[in-house]
Amino acid sequence: MKRIFDGMTSFSTERPKTTIAIILVFIFSLTPNAMFINFDNSEDAFFPDNETVRLLNEVEDEYQASIDFIRFIDDIDSGDLYKASTWEQLATLEAILLENQDLQEYQYPLFGIQPNSGMASAAIQWHNLQDPVTAESWISELQLAIDAVAASDNESLTGNLANLSAASSSIPSPSLVSATDLRNWRPEDPNLWLDRIDEEANLSSNLSVLSAGLTNLIQGPNSSEIAMVTGPISGKIGMLIGMQSIDYRSMMISNLPAEDSTEPWDSNGPVLTTFVVVTEPGEHGVEVIGDVQEKVSEWAEDLASQAKSETGDSEISVFSFSQLATGQNANLGKELGILNSLCLLLLGFILWTKFRSKRDTANVLVLTVFAILATYGMAGLLTLLGVKMVFNAAMNSIPILLLAIGVDYGLHVVARIREELQDQEKADPQGRGTLRDFSIEARRIAIRKGTILTSAALMVAIFTDMVGFLSFRFSSQQFLVSFGTVIAIGLFFIYLLSITALPALMMIIPPKKLPLEKSGKNDIGPVSSWIGSLVNVPQKVIVVTILISVPMFLGFQQLEVGFDTRDNFDDSVPVVQDFLLIADEFQSSPSPLYAVLDGDVISQEGRALYDSVVMELSDNPKTTGLPIGIWSVLEESRTTNSELDALMNGLSDDESSWSALETWLLTEEGRNISSGNLNSDASQTVISFQAATLDWQATADFESDLSANLADIADESDGDFIVQLSGRSLILAQVTADVADSAVISTGTVAAVILLMLVGINTVRQKDVIRGAARGFVTWIPLMVVVVWVYGIMGLTGYQLNSQTVTIGALTLGLGVDYAVHLTTRLEEEVEHAPSADPVVWSTKSVATTGRAMFGAALTTAGGFSVLNFSSLVPLQLFGQVFVVAIILALVSSLFVLPAMYTPFLKQDAQKYLANTESE
């Protein structure tokens, strides 16, 4: 393998223009494939493959639960709910939602049989169906008509029955509140009817009296004639009796902040008015969810403009999760562009201070950018070929990471080439005072030799890194799988361009007329001498390392997972502010949570289990609003469907009555009602509910406790049932809880792979398994020390693991092995050049040359990652800060710890070289 890459380097120095042409054709043919990359900034991209996710996919596929909530947010002052004008404005907002044709086309009946939920519609329903004051006139009129029929003789019966029939026309029929109803509503003084709602006033007693009166009418003579009139009236009364159990007060309160539930009418808002739409791409005739989100965002903006125009209230806002996705992504895209530009500028400045040459600086930066383009192109090509690769929020740092590492590699190559030029002049003085004074052939020799020598270390480091990062593909976390693959591809392209395109450019472009002594400082200074002298006291180095590692290990034990969903959002974006408001004030999850019941759902036992589950959900203090399931939908739907009402009334201990209902629910008419909550063979139903899910730890605890309670309820039921929980917010909490495991697994996997690679490479080079294993293990130990230090500092300083920093251990190992291989390779070179010298000389010379290059590389890498501190996203800020610390610690470990531990092997090499020399 080394011969192949060395041959590529030689070819690039012999035919540089051809090399550049080949590379440009390759990159420009590969880059367009980036269009095939699957960008998914939704939470799905973080989901693992487990039972909870599969259950969620089953629910969403069966019940078409890919939805969005479009919400008016209306700010009010305390006491405003006692004003009729406030209720009229809320009615206007809800009417605007119902009148919108786009919303109507894609409505999703999440709230029973309707897609909307608002305080105004709930209040109108209560007035129409439960308010004793509103019903007083028609109840009195109907009671008088019933009494008249009861007192009728044969002559007056016909007339009184006609009056009874006429009076029954005033009985309100349960129906959905329309936009017209909302616009025409003129509420009376809320101070009066809100008190009646609080007193749970309804028509139950009045309706019972009316029902009894109607029943008595058909007990006497002329019963058949009377029954023809009273039958339909009794049906209407029966429906109303069923409607008295609906808790309209809770429906209204669910649109207020959770903390106002005890004194709702004194709430200072805001008030939500909601409409639910389907966001399944197929329903909208598009292929990706992003197109749907853009469409929904446009609707939301139009609704906001209309609401402000009609109400004159400029503080009304509209929120949807589609707006959150598009707004946050647009802002994130701008931010990443700025951060990448800052990174380029900063790295360019740092490189210029090291190179003192704009052309060399430009060479390294441009080639690194080309390597990144090739990386994204290859990722797109792999996606096109069927490899599952999803770019998500956790991969936002990849361009900066590749920029920093690419500059790192380029710096090593250029520094080594300049060192070779200096050595040429020292070995054969010709008065060449600047870099330009060297002949083309002399430059070719220096460029080829310097690149090949650097390539030897880079190749070991790069392939160790690649195998380590590719080991992420064994992770259950999809974002880690994609992250590791893309990083591995990027590192390979950076290495490839560093050993081909970079030397080719340095051959084509004449070097700057830079004095040779300023082109690279390789003189041994006091710092290099002191670091080199540490090889004489390896015991002291090891003891100090252990003493430092002990508190770090204790800090490691204190490291916690601290992933808060809000950290992934830029709260300077208005739509993000609305999202956080809804999450905090209303304790509402971004999408519904589901209790999934499997078994004979439409049965007496199934109904009993359903009621127990609903009671458990309703009594849980962490849930908000009313749970909605198949039986609540049926209870609401029966008021407008006489056939369903008859089937519901006929339910008894007889199994055939339940079978009849199940059969009807699976008909086309029945599926129009039940499809949102009952699967196609009535063996599963879902109960949707809301809960506070922004805090991942609280959500994980909530899910664990509630799952256990629901499992107990299922076990105690009379039938064979299973009750499970699912929902996007619950899965995100699980993913977050798995972050700690992922950190351990990813770090452990990469550590094991790096150890195997180091052992394997050294075994091949030493042609001895034991010696190779020993060298590989000793090189590996300082890397693990760095990991302990990094995690220890994170624990001691309060840094927490999140979706970004979960990879810090693996990245630290990847960067650390680069430094370790560079230094050990240089140490072995120095031994080969001067086997009779003292170990201090080998170490000092290596630190003064390669060590300086490593310091410069660490400076550029740290500089590149430091720009992440300018991000508005906390995870990216933390990632940048922690990685800067990791870089510094990796450099310290390589320079101070590794030489002292590696010296015994260097002495063995020196003895071997001396023995070979004597034998010759």
Regions found by a protein language model. Give the residues of each.
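Membrane-embedded transmembrane helical bundles of large multi-pass transporters/channels
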Residues: 1-44, 54, 144, 188, ...
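Feature of extramembrane
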Residues: 1-359, 513-749, 767-770, 907-918
